[in-house]
Amino acid sequence: DRITQGAYTDYDKLLKIYEYTAKNFYYDSVAFSTHSYQYADPYDNIYNYENGLSSANSVSGRVHTTCQGFSAIYLALARAQGIPTRFVYGHRLAVPSNDWLTEDNIDVRDHWWAESYVNGKWIFVDPTVGTTNKYNKSTGAWTYTGLTNYTYFDASDEQVATSHVYMNI
């Protein structure tokens, strides 16, 4: 409830959860490129962050994870508020590098995001791209930028179609 404090509607609660996730966690591109997706346990990630603990994927409370972990954290917090939320996976276009004509891996399942049911419909939420916080496992460098955008919080169907391919809900 602390994370969603001041939010009165489910939609506002989801927005606060999105902001919390984007502000407080770091994307681990090395884990992604080496397919080390073991950092997805949302309960450990949240607990370690809130208590400043170190673990396999956290140092002094700074937690690094991949898209699967970002989405799992968002999903766990949304469900804790009683808001139906589900995992979705598929492929996210490597923008701005590629477009659908130049993308090599369209059929590769390599990205996770979420959908939450609010106001009578499922909304698209990709908490990974709400931040550019980065962790470089090779160098140990942490780059903090905080929340950088709301582009993929309740994104329109048209917007999603330009960047994501659904492979499973």
Description of each model-found segment:
Residues 1-61, 159-167:
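Secondary-structure boundary elements
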Residues 10-17, 21, 63-81:
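Active-site nucleophilic cysteine motif
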Residues 69-160, 164-167:
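Hydrophobic/aromatic-rich core segments of domains that either
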